[in-house]
C-alpha cells in the first residue's frame, strides 16, 4: 500500500460561484457630459473648489475597467506608457473585479475639453496636437512590447486647443522574448523575467516569442491606431471601423462602405460626414490589410494565443517560391506571398500620403 498522500485540491466551483464583496460603492448615476453615449465613465466637479478661483474648473473623470487589464503590479497596463502625463493626477481604485481609474483634470479658464468621438474636428493645429499625443504615447513602447486595445481600434483621449490627455484604455501590453533565431548570440536571451529575488524563484513573467514578423505586425498595427484615432476625431458621425464592441464583421463593414472611386483596392471613406472640408481620398485605407488589422485585433480576446495572431499582418504566405522578384503563375496571377508584400507596400504608401496631408515627418509615424 502506497504511503504517499494525495494533494488536496480546493473546490474551484465555490470560487466561481462566489459573489465578491465590493468595498467601494459603485458610483450612480454614470453620467459623463464629455462622453454622453458611454455607460462606463462619469465626470464631476469637486464642490470644495468652487470657492477657489484657481481650481474652480477642476474635473474628476472616472472610467470603470475590468480587473483583467491589471498587470502583475496591480497597475493598469495603459499607464506603462504615461511618461509625460497631461492630467493633473491619476488614482487607481480597486473594487473586487472592477477598477475605477480616476483622473483629476485642471483646465485653464478658457480651456474646454472634448472627446474624439464624433468630434468633427477641422482645425489642423488641434489635429496635430492629437496626432502628437498619440505618437508620443505609443512611441514609448519598446520593440519587444505589444499593445492590444480592446473595445475600440483607436487611442482614447480628450483634447482642447492646447493639449490632449490620454484616457484610461482597456488594453494589454505584452512583453516579448526574442526567438532563438533573432538573438545575436544564437541563444535564447531571458529578458522576460523582471521579478526580483526571491519572488522570481516562484513564478516568472509570461512572455510571447518575439520575431521579426511579429514586431513588424505590431508596428503596422500601431500606425493603424494613429490613423483610426484621427479618423474618429475628424468625423462628425460614428466611425464605421468602430466595430469591435458591436462584434460586427469587418468584411460586412468594408462591403457596405464600398470601393473608393479613385482606387478600387481601397475602402470608400471619402464620402463620410466630416466636420470640415472632406480630405478627399487621403482617409481611404487599403482594403485587404484593413481586414487584417481587425483579425489581428482579435488577439486581445485571447492573449495567450499569440502564435495565431502575433505575426498575422506581416506573415508571408507559404504559397509560391522563395524568389524576391514578383512571379506569375499559369493564370497570370501573383502568388499569395507576393500579394501580401504588395498589401504591405500599399499600406506604406497610404501612410505616406496620410503623413504628407497632416504635415508629419516620416520618422514620426
Curated annotation (Swiss-Prot):
It comes from the Viruses. Its main location: virion. One of its GO terms (cellular component) is virion component. Structural protein that participates in nucleocapsid assembly. Plays an essential role in the proper localization of the major capsid protein VP39, and the minor capsid protein 38K into the capsid assembly site. The keyword Glycosyltransferase does not apply. It is found in: Virion. It comes from Autographa californica nuclear polyhedrosis virus (AcMNPV). Keywords: Virion. This is Protein AC54. Pfam families: Baculo_VP1054. The keyword tRNA processing does not apply. Interacts with C42 and VP80. Interacts with protein 38K.
Amino acid at each position: 500500500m502506497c504511503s504517499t498522500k494525495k494533494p488536496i485540491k480546493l473546490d474551484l466551483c465555490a470560487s466561481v460561484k462566489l459573489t465578491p464583496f465590493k468595498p467601494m460603492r459603485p458610483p450612480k448615476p454614470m453620467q459623463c457630459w464629455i462622453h454622453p453615449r458611454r455607460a462606463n465613465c462619469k465626470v464631476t466637479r469637486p464642490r470644495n473648489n468652487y470657492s477657489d478661483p484657481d481650481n474652480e474648473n477642476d474635473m474628476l473623470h472616472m472610467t470603470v475597467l475590468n480587473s483583467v487589464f491589471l498587470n502583475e503590479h496591480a497597475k493598469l497596463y495603459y499607464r506603462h506608457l504615461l511618461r509625460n502625463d497631461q492630467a493633473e493626477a491619476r488614482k487607481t481604485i480597486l473594487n473586487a473585479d472592477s477598477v475605477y481609474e480616476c483622473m483629476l483634470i485642471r483646465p485653464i479658464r478658457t480651456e474646454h475639453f472634448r472627446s474624439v468621438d464624433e468630434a468633427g474636428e477641422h482645425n489642423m493645429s488641434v489635429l496635430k496636437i492629437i496626432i502628437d499625443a498619440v505618437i508620443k504615447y505609443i512611441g514609448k513602447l519598446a520593440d519587444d512590447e505589444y499593445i492590444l486595445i480592446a473595445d475600440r481600434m483607436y487611442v482614447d483621449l480628450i483634447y482642447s486647443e492646447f493639449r490632449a490627455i490620454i484616457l484610461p484604455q482597456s488594453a494589454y501590453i505584452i512583453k516579448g522574448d526574442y526567438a532563438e533565431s533573432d538573438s545575436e548570440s544564437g541563444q535564447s536571451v531571458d529578458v522576460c523575467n523582471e521579478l526580483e529575488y526571491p519572488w522570481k524563484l516562484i513564478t516568472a513573467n509570461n512572455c510571447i516569442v518575439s520575431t521579426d514578423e511579429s514586431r513588424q505586425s505590431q508596428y503596422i498595427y500601431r500606425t493603424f491606431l494613429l490613423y483610426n484615432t484621427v479618423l474618429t476625431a475628424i468625423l462628425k458621425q460614428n466611425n464605421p471601423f468602430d466595430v469591435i464592441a458591436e462584434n460586427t464583421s469587418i468584411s460586412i463593414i468594408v462591403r457596405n462602405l464600398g470601393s473608393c472611386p479613385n482606387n478600387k483596392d481601397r475602402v470608400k471613406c471619402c464620402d463620410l460626414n466630416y466636420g470640415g472640408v472632406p480630405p478627399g481620398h487621403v482617409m481611404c485605407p487599403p482594403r485587404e490589410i484593413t481586414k487584417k488589422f481587425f483579425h489581428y485585433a482579435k488577439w486581445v480576446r485571447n492573449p495567450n494565443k499569440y502564435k495565431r495572431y502575433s505575426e498575422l499582418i506581416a506573415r508571408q504566405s507559404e504559397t509560391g517560391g522563395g524568389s524576391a522578384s514578383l512571379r506569375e503563375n499559369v493564370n497570370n496571377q501573383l502568388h499569395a506571398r507576393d500579394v501580401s508584400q504588395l498589401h504591405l507596400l500599399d499600406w506604406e504608401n497610404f501612410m505616406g500620403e496620410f503623413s504628407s496631408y497632416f504635415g508629419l515627418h516620416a520618422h514620426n509615424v
